Amino acid sequence: MAGCRDPRVVDTLHLLLLVAVLPLAVSGVRRGAVDWTQEKNYHQPALLNVSSLRQVAEGTSISEMWQNDLRPLLIERYPGSPGSFAARQHIMQRIQRLQADWVLEVDTFLSQTPYGYRSFSNIISTLNPTAKRHLVLACHYDSKYFPHWDDRVFVGATDSAVPCAMMLELARALDKQLFSLKNISDSRPDLSLQLIFFDGEEAFHLWSPQDSLYGSRHLASKMASTPHPPGARDTNQLHGMDLLVLLDLIGAPFPTFPNFFPNTARWFGRLEAIEHGLRELGLLKDHSSERWYFRNYGYGGVIQDDHIPFLRRGVPVLHLISSPFPEVWHTMDDNEENLDRTTIDNLNKILQVFVLEYLHL
């Protein structure tokens, strides 16, 4: 995550007006014959019972995630660097080994930067690309470029190696359930899961509309011009995005995630409810009722991040970014030593339950 606070936290009136006119889902509304692009507005989660919640908590492993997913990403990985290539290969290899048979696409392009043209590569991993609708989880895998200082490099642990590792751990822990999405049935919506790892979120110099969000700007434009389902004349891949859940700045202790957008408030409410439910069952560790992670206390400033190019095109967004930012943000101390395992483990459980509920698994 890049830029200083002023350019990233912007006046939100125009964005809130945009999301306010997007269709709001109303519980209990009868769908009838609803166009498939509108089904997301009436989609309801399939809540997990206590036994299933316990299975999720038992099935995720912070130790395995830490060793196999996170540590290989704790390297310098700004766009075009050797570390960027290594991180990209690591992410793809971790996904390719899974049973669920993800379809991987690498979206590589050149873009002008303050330092000339640079190559960027987004990673898009999709379960059942033929499904009309997808729940999308996303993060950025690049790290901000800083000159080496006293032989130290910036590895961006919270920004955003941990979100990448959380998504990889979700794919591993839920592999068996996600494998079943290949078998479309009348009892389940035509809905699947997509993981996006953006390149070039960070600014090379100073945050600006031109020097930031390279990968997400490119991919949003590309998806808007790609027919979906294949051969469609009036719908594109953005129509197929039910909800974009963007993870950023995660891994520091005691995070707070506010709700930014009214049109996705009911899905933020599910995160709140899942957190409360898991705590009541004793499935969250060292979790205080005075420090809830998810707090719906109104709609504050919109933070510039990879969701913006999609939000402007009408995609519903949940922005899971800790606010205020971690104290280590954009410092050399954003490293493994300052991560909080318990917090990450708890958030893994909440996110995995959310995905299972959304996908009716």
Curated annotation (Swiss-Prot):
Binding of Zn(2+), residues: 159, 202, 330
Keyword field: Acyltransferase, Disulfide bond, Glycoprotein, Metal-binding, Secreted, Signal, Transferase, Zinc
GO cellular component: extracellular region
InterPro entries: M28_QC, Peptidase_M28, QC/QCL
Origin: domain of life: Eukaryota
Summary of the function given for this chain in its UniProt record: Responsible for the biosynthesis of pyroglutamyl peptides. Has a bias against acidic and tryptophan residues adjacent to the N-terminal glutaminyl residue and a lack of importance of chain length after the second residue. Also catalyzes N-terminal pyroglutamate formation.
Signal peptide start-end: 1-28
Name of the featured protein: Glutaminyl-peptide cyclotransferase
Subcellular location: Secreted
EC main group: transferase
Coiled-coil regions, chain positions: none
GO MF annotations, alphabetized: glutaminyl-peptide cyclotransferase activity; zinc ion binding
One GO-annotated biological process of the protein: peptidyl-pyroglutamic acid biosynthetic process, using glutaminyl-peptide cyclotransferase
Glycosylation positions in this chain: 49, 183
Tissue: Expressed mainly in brain tissue.
